[in-house]
Amino acid sequence: MGPLTPFRERRFLACFVTGTLAASGNWMLSLSVPYLVYEMTNSTSWLGVSAVASNLPALIASPLGGVFADRYSKRALLLISGGIQVVLALTLFAMSRSGALDIGNLIALAIAMGFASSTQTSVYQSFVAEIVPARQISAAYRLNAIQFNVSRAIGPAMAGFVLHRWDATTAFLLNAIAFAPLLCVLAVIGTRDVTRSVATSVIGEIAAGALLAWRDHRLRLAVLIGTLCSMFGMSIYSLAAGLAKDVFRVDEAGLGLLVSSVGIMSFLTAILAVSLGDRLKRSTLVMSGLVIYGLGLWIVAATDIFVVGMLGFGITGVAHVMVNVSVTTTVQTYVPPEFRGRVTSFQLMGIMLALPVGAQVGGLVADY
């Protein structure tokens, strides 16, 4: 089986293309919101607050999404969560255009978007396994890493262009539009039959998933590594708006390029990871990725030269893929199908909760 075999499945290909567009819209939003926050407040501490607002809902939404994903149709859950995100993006657009959007409203809507996005992310990660044959699951998740990183390259670049050419209001509208193709695909595709968990109590099901993830050392280590990398590595992306303006002295287009450098290098690394398949041990990739993460962060911290800063951001993108693809593939390979949604949600919850903690600490230190 070749590394691109999952693309022969029309369902996977359709979700890959439209999911990339929707994720690009989300990345554009994730840059536009902190940009607008910084424009309103001129404070890196508020950037940390916006990161907390966007990611803290994962504490509730991610495990609930995991439980629902194991109980119910993942396709239906994705349609609902995607529809909610469209409504919220249109609300941001309408309030921004009318001049009614202030920092309080923006943070409140960021929290609501965080709930919807966290639910969708945890459900989509486990949904991939239902649109390819079981033997293609590992290859599909490697390709899914390409989807994530293509969108991370396109989204910030689009945001930089839109913010420079127009404003955040336009970015909010484009985010809503970007979801339409994925919702259309989800409305018509079918999925393969999988084992579903028997509904008991929500808390009991969350506890059962947590117990499984903790007792299996492979799953436990994967979740912990992803969490720590998010706290000490990925959190720097939430501070990009402040770094671009105050350290590197660049405008909106420069901010887009700074964050896109992460996506571009991540994309190239993801292609290499897909082509290599299982020829490199996942443990080797993770350990190497952790070292490279430290190198990239050190470069960003040590310079005020924009091009060098882009290099540092790009290096963290290489490291992120090396760690994230290995961690995600490990989780999806070893988790039982009836627990896939819950264990995946714990992995994502760790990443999403650690990110704002790191961003908040970084923002406070930067202001100090």
Where are these regions (language model features)?
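Loop-to-transmembrane helix entry/capping segments in MFS-fold secondary transporters
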Residues: 44-45, 134-144, 252-253, 337-346
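Cytoplasmic helix-loop-helix junction between adjacent transmembrane helices
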Residues: 109-150, 156
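Hydrophobic core of transmembrane alpha-helices in multi-pass small-molecule transporters
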Residues: 20, 101-119, 227, 308-322
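MFS-fold secondary transporters
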Residues: 38, 91-95, 113, 185-186, ...
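Helix-loop junctions on the cytosolic side of multi-pass membrane transporters
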Residues: 99, 126, 130, 168, ...
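Helix-loop boundary and gating motifs at the non-cytosolic
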Residues: 2-57, 215-262
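C-terminal transmembrane bundle of multi-pass solute transporters/carriers
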Residues: 60, 64, 71, 77-81, ...
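Transmembrane alpha-helix termini and helix-breaking/packing motifs in multi-pass membrane transporters
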Residues: 34-40, 92-98, 154-174, 246-247, ...
